[in-house]
Amino acid sequence: MKARIDAIIQRNQAEYLEQLIPQTDLLLREMEEYGGEHGVPSADREVALFCEITARAANATRCLEIGMAIGYTSLHLARAVGEDGLVVTIDPSDEMIKAAEGYLTRAGLRERVRIERGKRWTLFRSSKILLI
């Protein structure tokens, strides 16, 4: 669970919930450690898993992610959309994009993710997007 417990749940509740979450694979664990060591803003394991489960439940074949960082949530979403699906993700940082491409390639999911370099509003200036 998170390093600090939210005010919503107590420590023993958090520990119980932690036991319900499947063990993460080695690549995801490496990404978590890298993110922690380098101060990379990233979703918690619980949040990324929630995104994956939600995408699967919705039978989503296309997902949009804004702010990819090292690709932690992108990887979860790419698993969810399946072989013919696509995750479009946006990040302004060349450093983060390079790291994410490496992790996604190692996971065998790079072809499911289209990475756009830029800031969210400049990429969608002409689009009429209502909800992301």
Feature names for model-found ranges:
Residues 1-23:
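N-terminal auxiliary segments of SAM/dcSAM-dependent transferases
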Residues 7, 32-33, 114:
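Homeobox/homeodomain signature
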Residues 13, 27, 47-50:
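Short N-terminal amphipathic alpha-helix/helix-capping patch enriched in small hydrophobics
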Residues 14-18, 32, 101:
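Amphipathic alpha-helical segments within well-ordered protein domains
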Residues 21-33, 40-41:
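S-adenosyl-L-methionine
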Residues 36-37, 41, 45-132:
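S-adenosylmethionine/decaboxylated-SAM
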